Amino acid sequence: CALPICGLGHAVLCAQHLIGNEPFAVILSDEVIDADVPALAQLMKVFDDGNGVVLGVQKVRREDVSHYGIVDAERVADGLHRIVGLVEKPSPSQAPSRFAAIGRYILSPEIFPILEQTTPGKNREIQLTDALRQLVQDAPSYAQEIDGQRYDAGDKLGFLQATVEFAL
């Protein structure tokens, strides 16, 4: 992994030698989540119940779907959905739902060979979403609605909001 920064998929692939053949979590640091039960613990409960890949999601406004990876999913239980597809930053008219993937994932090691075969996409980067789109076709995959307040710290306003909320 001596290549320059090549996308989130590449970053995950670079960790393969540390992860081996075990399930693992991906936590995007620009998504700050304030919750009574940590977001990852919410996902672990679903995973520990025998489910495969688990993505954390929250509903976003229809006009905001174009800023996120959006899951196409079927409701299984309250707050839990089986993923049937993923769309990266769709237009509001093309979005299959309003459930945005919010930077907390539990993935299986089956993602690694898929990432190795993933052609660089937008900005010539290996996109994790492209590999996830294939993985959800091959393995049981679920979206768990995260109970908590999310702040997009990758956005200046979101960063300021998180700073103020956590400082009070």
What would you call each of these model-derived segments?
Residues 2-73, 109, 116-118:
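Conserved beta-loop-beta/alpha segment of the NTase-like Rossmann-fold superfamily
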Residues 25, 44-48, 77-168:
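Catalytic-core segments of class I nucleotidyltransferases/pyrophosphorylases
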